[in-house]
Amino acid sequence: MRARANRARVAMGIRDPNSKMLESAWKAQELGYAQVVLVGIKKEIDKVGTELEVVDTDEPEKTLAELMISRKVDAAIRGTAKASGALAQLKEALGKKRICRLALLLTVDGTPFFLAPVGIDEGNTISDKLRMIKLGAEHIRRFGIEPRVGVLSGGRIGDIGRNKRVDRTLADGEFVTRRAVELGINAKHYTILIEDAIKESNFIVAPDGISGNLIFRTIAFLGGGDGLGASVLMDDYVFVDTSRVGGHFTKAIMLASALSHLNKERQKVIY
């Protein structure tokens, strides 16, 4: 509903275009979610064929960030632009060394939940995890949802002593959960029991970025679930990271448009 109410201009990065990805972008526009702007090499896009607006560039990663910062679009999604390049350009445009992403997924039975960290270089320290939990909780509240955080670690409490690395994740999980509660966030440490966490939580915190990325891929590409995209957590702009594997971007465009609407509503309240 928020996406249709907003119908934002959403830029989508394009590399190696094919009919499946362009049709998914067209579907988002046809359903009224957004006015979609494709960002990539125009002759390659035209060869596949589309009626969508195209910004011609051989550097979609850079152009996406420029369009977002200049506010020529209301939101952007990575699409099939290169991950490392797009995120590096985004950091440079924002003047930040690090960014946090929060993924929105659906399980095979349609249960929605948020997940972090999802980048292999994210969430590898206690301070990183706490920052993600704090920013993630604020982000989730913008949807009118009260976050319930499920912190995961590498084993059960009874496994302490079997492996030093597992022991470390268990200790970190206990500490992170305690600090989150002190910050006024509803959080619980579920150890390695993700199957229990998903029953009670709507925000899953993985032990590190590698395991978070594996959870995302397992659910979205092997387990019959769906990954809508991973929003970069920031106040002034909307950027949704996407995986090139699935090839479907309709829901990511819908998410970006909805987030743009929420940002505009929040700015009205602030000002």
Curated annotation (Swiss-Prot):
UniProt keyword terms in alphabetical order: Methyltransferase, Transferase
Disulfide bonds: none
Gene it is expressed from: mtxX
An annotated Gene Ontology molecular function: methyltransferase activity
Entry's Gene Ontology BP terms: methylation
Lineage: Archaea, Methanobacteriati, Methanobacteriota, Stenosarchaea group, Methanomicrobia
EC number: 2.1.1.-
Family recorded in the similarity comment: Belongs to the MtxX family.
Subunit structure: May be part of a complex composed of 3 subunits; MtxA, MtxH and MtxX.
Full protein name: Putative methyltransferase mtx subunit X
